[in-house]
C-alpha cells in the first residue's frame, strides 16, 4: 500500500509523452507522423487508461483506510524562503482523478471518429493529452504554487481547444473572450495566494490550514484583510467555473469541437473551480462571511443560468447554460458547508453532462450530412426535430441524460441534486425556494432541448418549421418567432426566424473550412461490429460505432453512479460508499449525522422534488410538443390561441422572457458597452495623449528650434559679416538687459 502511494507522483506525467512526441514528430518527421496519426489516438487512450487503473487502486485504498498521503521535495531553501513541490493523495484527489480519467478516455475514443476528417487531428489529440496532464497535476498538487502553475496550464489548454478552429473568426473571438475573462479571476487568485503567504508564511496546505487556524483562534489577524484575500482566492474559482459575474465566456466556448465541450463541462476546466473551493474549504469555514458570499454567488448562478437557457436555439449553448446552473448548485452546496453533496453532484453531473454533449455531437454530426459544415445550421434546434427514427441510440441516450439532469429517479443527478435541495432548507428558506424553483426550470429547458431536437418532423425538409401552415400556437413553441420557407432541394436556409428587433436573421452561406479541412473519413482505431452507415443520406443517420461506444458506457454511468452516494446505513448494512470515501468530511449542516437517512423523510422530499421536475417537463411538453400532436384537440390549447387582454399580457411576459434569455440577460451587452467600450475609449485617449502631449512637447521644441534657425539663416544671407553683426548685436542686447535689470 505504501508503495502504491510512493509512485502516485507519476499520475500527471503518464499522458505527457503523447503531446511531446507529436510535437517533435511534426517538427522532424511530419509526413510519417501524419501517416501514423491513428497510433497517437491509441497511445493517448492507453496511457490515460493506465492512469485510471492506478487511480482506482488509490481510491480503493482511500475507501478502506481513509488515509491521506503527502510527499514533498524541497526545491528552493534559504533562511527567509523555502519552496517545495510534491503531491497530495486524499479522498478529493482520488475522486477527481477517477472522474478526469474515465470521462477523458471516453471523450478520446469518441474524438477518434468525430475528428477523423480534420487536418488538425494530431493537434487535437496533443492538446487533449496535455489537458489531461494539466488537470491531473492540478488535483494532485500539495501547495498553492503548484495549484497556480497547473491552473494556468489548464487554462492554456482550454483556450487552445476553444479556438481550435482559429480560422473561423467567431472561434478566435471566443478564445480571446475566455482568455480575458479568466485573466480577471486568475489575477485575483494570484493575489489571494500571495496574501495568505504573507499571513502564514507557507504555501503547503497542511501548514497553511494549521497556522491560519492558530492565528484565528488567537485573534492575531486582520479579518478585513483576510476576508479580502479569501474573496480573491474565490475569484479564481468564479472565473474558472463560470459563476456570475464571470460566466460570459462559457457559452462562447462552444465554438470548439464538441468532444472538448464535453470534457470541459464534465471533468476539467469548469470542475477546477469547484475543486479549488473544496480543497480550500478548511480555510474558508473559519473566515466570517466568506461562506455566505460563496453560497450567494452560487444561488445567483443557479437561477441566472437556468433563465438564460430557456430560449437558446443552439443545442450546445443550451447545454452550456445548463452546466452553468448546475455548477451554481455545487457552489451553493459548498457555501452551505455541505461538502459531500457538492462533490456528489460534481460526480453525477459529470457523467450526465458528458452523455448529453456527446449525444449532441452525434446529432450535429448527423445534421452535417444535410446542411454541411456550418455550426449556425447544424447546431440549430429549429432545423432539427423528428430525429427519433433516424438516430434511435442517440435519442435514447440523450433522453436518459435529460431525465437525469431533470432529477428523475433513479438516474444519477436525482440523488445528488435532491440532497442539495434538502440541505438548502436548513441553510436559508429564501435560497431553498430559489433552488427548488430552478429545479423546475431545469426540467423545462432540458425537456425543451430534447423535444425540439428529437420529436416532431425534420424541420429542415419543410417549408415551415411545423410542416404545416403557421399557427399562433406553434409560434409559442418558438417564442413568437415565425418560421420561413426553405428553398430548393439543397436545403439552403434563406431566412430562419424573425427577431424581436424587426430585422431578419440570415444564416451565412459561407461555410468555414476547418483548418484546410477535407473529409478523408479515415477509419477509427476502435472497431465494434455495428450496423454501418456507408451511404450518402438525405436524412440524418446514426453515428458510427466508435462514437456510440462511449455514449453507451456513459449511459451505464448515468444509470448507476448515483447509487455511489445513497446514504443507506441501517441494520448493519453500509452501502454509502461516498461517505466512507470522504471520511472525515466537512458538513456544517449535519454535524452529528451518522450518514444514514430517515426513509420516510427522504421519500417525502423526493416526491416533492420529482413533482416540481415533472411539472417543468409537462409545461415543456405542452409548449413544445408539435402542433400536429394529440394536444391540438384539447380545448386548453384553444384558450391559449384566442386573442384578448390575457393573451396580450401572456405574450408580453413570454417575449420579455425570450428577450432576457436570447440576449443573455443583457450582461454581455453591458460588458461590451461599459467595460470593453470604455477600455477602448481609454486606450484611444491614452494613444492621443502619448502621441500629441508626451511626444508633442519634445517634438514641438525641436520644430521651434528648426524654424528659428531657418529664420536666422535667411536673415543672415549666408555672409560672415552679417553673422558677426547679428552675433555682436545679440550680445550687446543681453549685456544691456543684464545691466539694467541689476541696477
Curated annotation (Swiss-Prot):
The keyword DNA damage does not apply. It comes from the Eukaryota. Keywords: Chloroplast, Membrane, NAD, NADP, Plastid, Plastoquinone, Quinone, Thylakoid, Translocase, Transmembrane, Transmembrane helix, Transport. Its main location: plastid. GO terms for cellular component: chloroplast thylakoid membrane. One of its GO terms (molecular function) is NADH dehydrogenase (ubiquinone) activity. It is found in: Plastid, Chloroplast thylakoid membrane. InterPro entries: NADH_UbQ_OxRdtase_chlpt_su5_C, NADHpl_OxRdtase_5_subgr, ND/Mrp_TM, NU5C-like, Proton_antipo_N. Its EC number is 7.1.1.-. It catalyses: a plastoquinone + NADH + (n+1) H(+)(in) = a plastoquinol + NAD(+) + n H(+)(out); a plastoquinone + NADPH + (n+1) H(+)(in) = a plastoquinol + NADP(+) + n H(+)(out). Disulfide bonds: none annotated. The chain crosses the membrane at residues 9-29, 40-60, 89-109, 125-145, 147-167, 185-205, 219-239, 258-278, 283-303, 327-347, 354-374, 396-416, 425-445, 548-568, 607-627, 723-743. The keyword Transport applies. GO terms for biological process: ATP synthesis coupled electron transport; electron transport coupled proton transport. NDH shuttles electrons from NAD(P)H:plastoquinone, via FMN and iron-sulfur (Fe-S) centers, to quinones in the photosynthetic chain and possibly in a chloroplast respiratory chain. The immediate electron acceptor for the enzyme in this species is believed to be plastoquinone. Couples the redox reaction to proton translocation, and thus conserves the redox energy in a proton gradient. NDH is composed of at least 16 different subunits, 5 of which are encoded in the nucleus. This is NAD(P)H-quinone oxidoreductase subunit 5, chloroplastic. It comes from Carthamus tinctorius (Safflower).
